[in-house]
Every structure is written in C-alpha cells, then in structure tokens.
Regions:
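Extracellular/oxidizing-compartment recognition motifs
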Residues: 1-42, 46-424, 432, 449-450, ...
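Short helix-capping and inter-helix turn/linker motifs at the boundaries of alpha-helical repeat units
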Residues: 97-98, 301, 428-429, 481-482, ...
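Alpha-helical support elements that line or immediately flank enzyme active sites
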Residues: 116-120, 130, 308-325, 353, ...
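Active-site acid/base region of carbohydrate-active enzymes
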Residues: 124-125, 195, 211-220, 372-405, ...
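Active/binding-pocket-proximal capping segment
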Residues: 126, 134-142, 458-459, 509-514, ...
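C-terminal capping/lid segments that line or modulate ligand- or cofactor-binding pockets
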Residues: 169, 234-235, 239-240, 425-426, ...
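Non-catalytic C-terminal accessory modules of carbohydrate-active enzymes
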Residues: 193-197, 211-247, 273-282, 598, ...
Length: 848
C-alpha cells in the first residue's frame, strides 16, 4: 500500500497505489506502478506477503519517501560571492586564497509550519544551518560529482527547525571541488556556489517558497582551503580564529555589513544525491604522543585512515599551530597534507577539518607552547554511511588479518560515493583500480545507491566520440581500455549482485558507444596503440614493475608500447564484447548480442594466432595474470585449454614459487579466473605468503592498510590489490550466486587438509541473510547453512562418506526442505528450501 499521508496508511487506504495480491516469487526490485507522483510529494508505504498456504504476514512497519525536483521545478538561482575568484599568476595555478563563504537569508513565518523541506545543491561542499543549528549529521556533502556537467542536491527536512516569526537559513560553503581544474568551463567560475529552494507548508495549507537569489547576503568565513585541489595539492585547511563571528548563523545576528551575493548561470544538470551521505563513522583514539624536538610533537593515531583530525588548543593570539600528516613513521608529511590553526583573541579553541580531509597515521604538531595530552586529540574516519552485508572469520590469523585490512582499506577509499585510488595524492575514481575493488565491495557492503551514483558519473564523462576517460567523476589520470571498460564491468557486476535490470538498460547506450569507439582504434581485428605516455596502459604495478618500467624508459619506451600490454588490452576487448553480449541478451537485443559475439570470435582468433607460444603453451611472457585472462576469455582453443591451465599452475607454483604475480588490472583477472574455476588451492597458496610479493608482506610493513605496489614504495592506503577480499566469503565460506541477486545460490566451501578447519561467513542479500558456518573436528564436518525466504540453495559436498550424512538427527533423505539435486561418486549436491540446516558428515580425506 502507498498513501499520501500517514493517517491514510494507518487506515489501510492506499490512495496512491494498492498492488493487491500478486502471485509471484519476486520480492525485490518491485517497481512502483501507482498514481503519477509530483515533485516534493511525500509517500508513505507498507507491505505484507503470504506463503504458499495463503497465510498472511503482518504489515511491515510504515516507511516513507519524498519525491525530488525536476529541472522545471527549480525557481532558485545559483549564488556565489563576487569577491571570491580563484587566483592564478600568468596562467599558473597558485595556492587557493579564497576563504570559504558564508551565506544568509532571513524570512518570517506567521506560524510554525506543518511541513518544510529544503533542497540544497552546491558546487563544492556545503553545510546547512537553520536558526543557528546545523541540519543533519552528514559531512562533506554532497557526493563528489562531475561539476562540468552536473551538480547534486541534498534534501533536508527542516520542519522542526523553523519557528513562528523570524527565521534564518544559513549556508557554509567549502571551496573544495569547485576549483578542481577538470571541472572548469566558461559559464561556471572556479568558486563555490549554491542553489537553494525551501518548500514550506503551513497548517492552513498555505505554501511558501524560499529560494536563493540576489537578496541573500555573504561574508568570508574563518576557514580557507590550502592548496588548489588537484593531484598532489589537496593539502588541507587554515582556520583563523581571529576572523570568527559568533552566532553568524543565528536569527538575531547583525549582517548589515555583509555583501550581497552574485547570481550565476551555469548550465548544470541538477540531480538528487540519492546515496548514503558521508558521516563520522569511527572515532580514532591516539596511541601516543612524543616530543621529537623542543616544541614539536608527533602523535601516533594507531592506524592509517582518511577523515578528520580534531584537537583542543590554546595559545596566544596570532599563534599558528601546524598539523602535518604522514603515512610513514619516518616521514614528516605525506603528499603535502597539512592544516593550520591560528589562535584568536579567545586564546583557545578546537581545530577540526570541515571541507577537506586528511590521510595518515602520524601527525606532527608544531607551534604549541605546551605538551598536548591524548585526551585533547581524536580522529574521525569518514565514509558514506552504507551498511556491512558480508562477514568472514576463520582459524588462520593471517587470513583474518588480510580480510580485515582489505575492508578497512576499501572503506577509507570510498569517501564521496566513489572509490578512489588513494585519498591523499590523487583522489581519482580510476576504472582500472575499480577492477580490483568492485567485487570485493559488492560482496561485503550494501552498495546499491553507491554504485548507481558512480555509474551515472561514468555515463556523464563519456566524450562525444564515444571514448570514456580513465576516471570518473574526476576526468583526469592515465589508463587504458580496462580503465574505460569499467563502464561495462560496473553495470554487469551490479546486476549480478542485485538483479536490478535498470542499471543495464540505463548504461547500454554508453556501452555501445564505447565499443564503437574501440573499433576506430583497431586494425586487422586487434586494437593498436593510441594516445600518449599515460594512455593504452595494460596491467599496472605488477611485482617488479618499477624496475621494468625504469628499463623501458631508458630505451625511450612507455608501458603502452609493450607486447604484453597489446596482448592484455586485446584480451580485455574480448571480455568487454562478451560481457556486452550478455547484457544485450538480458535486455532482449538478440541481434546486437550476436554481433558482439561474432566480433569477439574474430578478435579471439587474431589474438591467439599472434601471441600464442606453442612451445611453452603460453602467451607473451607467461605471467600468470596474462594466462588467466586468456583462459577467462576462452582464448586458447578447446584442445589447448588444459595445457594452458597446466602452464598457469607451473608459473604460479614453480616459476613464482607460490607468489601472486599480477598488478591492479591483470591481477584482478588472475584472482577471479582462479576463483570462478574453483582453484582455491592456488589462491590459498598465494594468500599465505608473507614475503614479497604478498599481502602478508604488506601487513608486516603497513599501518593497517594495503599499499599501492607490492614493493610498498608508493601510497600506503591504496586500492591496488583489494580483489583478494572477494575470495573469503565466496570460496572459504562457499557462498556463490548462481542467479542474479542471489535468488538462487550455491553453498560450496573449500574444505581441505591444508586450508582453514573452521569458517564462519555470511552475506546479507536483499532476500535476507545467507550463512555458511562450518568446522572439521576429528574428521567430521559440521556445517550450518541458512537459506533466506523466497530463495533456494544448492549445497555441494565432495569427498564425503554419504552413509554418514545427516541433517540434525535425521538422515539427509528424511530432512524437511532437503532434496537430491545430483550425486556422483563421493560427491553430492542437495537442493535446499528456505530455512536453517545443520549437517554433519564424515570426511573421506581424513581431515582432523
């Protein structure tokens, strides 16, 4: 039921939509089919369901949503400060000198409103205040977006903030992304701007609208961005407490000396920020404070993180206290990340970031007249407020540590509702890096809104000729076809995880145009090198990449010039075409799907003929990652596949001595090829290595996060090798999807003598929580499986004594909800209906 008011919903009167009883097994991704809705409308809904016997559940708790605004619904104008323009000298960027602006608008209400909502779009970050109080607990809002084409607005319910009589709406804007060079255009100056529209309904039914226009007032705030918001120059903030104006956002504040705002007219699409906002997720407590030289203190925050640093301070007016943040214990400052607090006439105050954020573990503080104490300092890890959906734990500490560190690293890369390569140096949403993070992220977090937003960013940045940049929404940085090809990978992986076909239909035009663009870069059924030094990249940051790259540069070559790069990029082209064909099939575009498959077949033949090494049953230099992608895209003919697989095993176990040998992009294909083909023995061998190259080596040298490169030379908080995070629940827990959205799934844990002997894992799907918990003791496997309502599972067990297989106290054949699916030798597959099952069976392998 969907109603226009809570009262109607309570009375079961659905004036907007009553679906009636629908006989279907679909219970997620249900599309609204009721009365057409209007802008700003609030809708209240609830649902109930019946089982196969016709027994009805109780009604769900009431919930609601509010409709957003379309382009024609906006009556507001973009406003900014005429005095705040980005500075440059002779065309060269210089550090920002614009203070972050304050805006105010006062107005009168004849009575307390019945309902009031305000929409705030901004170029750059914003904070909203009504009558002196900050609205909501979101920070660094809105989500990062491509300000060359779009701005996102936040929706705030301010009913309880308003009063009868005088009121004030105030904004604090952050310069931040407003001056990002890639976002500039002639009709949009490099300044923070806001678009504000409040819709107020009084008890009488009278409707009022407060909008941003030339009547608003502005003044410089005490906060100023440091740097100029570009790679290597994100820096921090300077807060000058001498410039504070108490109660600047209060009703009775005297703003008579404030300037009028200036109205601007940027041609930006304005869209709702339909994601979980950034919030203060976790408080970080420092471990220690050390005085390294007289008056200079070094704080160890205990873990590398991205977010805010907060400290209570005191001093003499004019004192400048400098905070420098670093990822490494011996470094004073990493990537120029630093902030400044200038003491004001009150002689005390609190520094905390507001419109920027820091990254690091250590903070070097200078300018104090006293030794600080731990209780004066805290940090805040910030990310969008999405929820965890997956969990894993086993009896091998190294694997638990890799899993936890992978997820902590990922969370610290997601601030702004896109996944960055690193949060300090570049802050770019690289598509190549996303190959390493997406499957891990989807398998461990509820990220429907997050990835829907990021896919919209990728559609936004596509160029007129069909090319897709290597990053979104940031539009800068190097890469190659596997970076741009994320415009295919993302909607496909999203659909597989959530079963929502809409992201496929919305993204398919982008996919088609990009594949058309690739055809313009091909000759004789293969892509050829195009672009400059940082284009046409293949794999990136594999083990020993630094030395190989240095040797090439001495020869005047770039990474895009190598035979291995040409091979990988053409294999990825096949992968892109085959994935696009699957998407086309689902959307009903059968002719298009057939065309893509035919094209992939032509390219496959050309690539195999050009690159296959028949003497070694290998491709190019034989790196495992290149053999893996060849197998994933069916490059070797059927009569050669077994030989190439054996070569891959030899490369891993013998030539690489059991170490992982792949970079960001090709490495993701190595991990996922092995995972999808149940070669968990090989993944386990590589995951357990504690020397170079390996995750264990990173843990030994790191600060609770994973590095940019296997050598641990670059960034210490990076996205490069997070693909390992997809292995734990899928393989060791054995929870694998067979139908999109986990309508049907497999439980097939990897159980072997050399692997874990105890595992607890779960994935909270849209249908409910899936659990796979197992342990082997004295040769007996005990396995607990939970199958959510309206789903089915296939439980696969091998190398067992079938005569001893029980569910609870019953033999499996008599267990309710359990039926035989297939049986072959010592292996059995059972079909499970919804419910919780406890199986026990003797293992033939002699596991202890």
């Amino acid at each position: 039921l969907v109603s226009s008011s809570e009262a109607l919903l309570d009375a079961n009167r659905a004036d907007l939509w009553d679906s009636g009883r629908i006989n279907t097994n679909e219970s997620v991704n249900i599309v609204y089919e009721g009365v057409p809705l209007i802008a700003g409308q609030k809708c209240f809904w609830k649902v109930r369901f019946s089982d196969e016997q016709g027994n009805w559940s109780s009604w769900s708790a009431p919930a609601s949503w509010r409709m957003g605004l379309l382009a024609d619904d906006w009556g507001a104008q973009w406003i900014g400060s005429e005095k705040m323009e980005a500075q440059s000298v002779g065309g060269r960027k210089v550090n920002n000198v614009m203070p972050d602006p304050w805006f105010r608008k006062t107005f009168n209400l004849e009575t307390i409103p019945q309902d009031a909502v305000i929409y705030v779009a901004s170029v750059g970050y914003h904070e909203l205040y009504v009558n002196g109080k900050k609205v909501g607990d979101a920070v660094l809002s809105p989500s990062v977006t491509d300000h060359k084409s779009r701005a996102r607005y936040m929706t705030y319910d301010i009913t309880n903030y308003l009063q009868s009589g005088n009121n004030v709406i105030a904004l604090w804007l952050g310069t931040s992304w407003s001056i990002f060079p890639a976002y500039q255009r002639e009709d949009k100056p490099a300044i923070p701007m806001a678009l504000v529209q409040a819709e107020i309904i009084l008890p009488s039914g009278k409707e009022l609208q407060i909008t941003s226009d030339e009547s608003w007032k502005t003044h410089a705030s005490p906060n100023t961005l440091l740097g100029y918001w570009e790679a290597h120059h994100f820096e921090g903030e300077c807060y000058d407490a001498a410039l504070e104006k108490d109660n600047w956002n209060a009703i009775d504040f005297d703003d008579s000396d404030w300037e009028q705002v200036k109205v601007y007219h940027p041609a930006l699409k304005v869209s709702s920020d339909r994601t979980e906002p950034n919030r203060l997720i976790q408080e970080i407590t420092p471990l220690s404070i050390q005085e390294i030289t007289p008056g200079v203190y070094r704080v160890d925050m205990g873990v590398n993180y991205a977010g805010w640093f907060e400290m209570q301070l005191k001093g003499q007016p004019g004192d400048s206290i400098v905070f420098q943040f670093s990822e490494r214990e011996k470094d004073v400052c990493s990537y120029g990340i630093h902030s400044i607090y200038k003491v004001g006439p009150k002689r005390k105050g609190t520094f905390c970031n507001r419109f920027n954020y820091m990254t690091g573990r250590w903070v070097q503080i200078s300018g104090l007249r006293y030794k600080p104490t731990i209780d004066q300092i805290r940090g805040w890890m910030i990310r969008p407020d999405y929820r965890r959906s997956g969990g894993f734990e086993c009896d091998i500490p190294l694997l638990n540590n890799i899993y936890r560190t992978t997820l902590w690293t990922l969370e610290n890369l997601s601030l702004g509702n896109y996944v960055v390569d690193c949060p300090h140096r570049e802050r770019c949403g690289y598509g190549g890096d996303a190959l390493a993070t997406t499957r891990t992220a989807l398998g461990n977090y509820q990220l429907g809104a997050f990835y829907n937003k990021w896919m919209e960013d990728w559609r936004d940045v596509q160029e007129a000729d069909g090319n897709v940049p290597y990053t979104a929404p940031t539009r800068i940085g190097g890469g190659g076809p596997s970076w741009s090809g994320f415009c295919i990978t993302l909607p496909w992986e999203f659909y597989r995880q959530y079963g929502d076909i809409r992201i496929l239909s919305e993204s398919f035009p982008t996919i088609q145009r990009w594949l058309d663009f690739l055809e313009t870069k091909s000759q004789h059924n293969m892509l050829v090198r195009w672009g400059g030094k940082w284009s046409f990249l293949g794999d990136w940051l594999w083990p020993d990449a630094w030395s190989e790259r240095s040797a090439m540069e001495k020869q005047g070559k770039a990474l895009g010039d190598t035979r291995e790069t040409l091979f990988f990029n053409n294999c990825h082209w096949i992968y892109s075409l085959e994935t696009a064909a699957r998407i086309a099939d689902i959307l009903g575009h059968k002719t298009v799907a057939a065309t893509y498959r035919k094209r992939a077949s032509e390219i496959r033949k050309a690539v195999h003929t050009t690159f296959f090494d028949s003497r070694n049953n290998s491709y190019v230099n034989g790196y495992p990652s290149y053999l893996a992608i060849a197998l994933m895209v069916d490059l070797p003919p059927e009569n050669l596949r077994t030989k190439v697989w054996k070569r891959l095993e030899q490369e891993i176990l013998v030539n690489r001595k059991g170490h992982f040998w792949g970079g960001i992009t090709a490495g993701s294909f190595l991990l996922h090829t092995l995972l999808d083909n149940h070669r968990d023995d090989l993944i386990f061998e590589m995951a357990m290595k504690e020397d170079f190259p390996g995750w264990g080596n990173m843990l030994e040298k790191g600060n609770g996060t994973l590095f940019e490169d296997w050598e641990c030379r670059g960034s210490a908080l990076h996205s490069s090798y997070l693909y390992i995070g997809s292995w734990f629940i899928e393989a060791l827990g054995g929870i694998r999807r067979t139908e999109s959205g986990y309508k049907q799934f497999i439980i097939e844990p990897w159980i072997t003598e050399k692997g874990p002997q105890q595992v607890r894992s779960h994935y909270n799907s849209m249908y409910g929580n899936i659990e796979s918990n197992w342990a082997v003791n004295s040769g007996v496997l005990n396995l607990e499986v939970t199958v959510p309502a309206n789903t089915t599972a296939i439980l696969k067990l091998s190398d067992i004594d079938l005569e001893t297989l029980k569910e609870g106290d019953s033999i499996w054949k008599e267990a309710k909800g359990v039926s035989l699916y297939t049986q072959k030798g010592k292996a059995i597959s059972l079909a499970l209906q919804s419910g919780t099952y406890r199986f026990s069976v003797t293992m033939n392998s002699g596991l202890q």
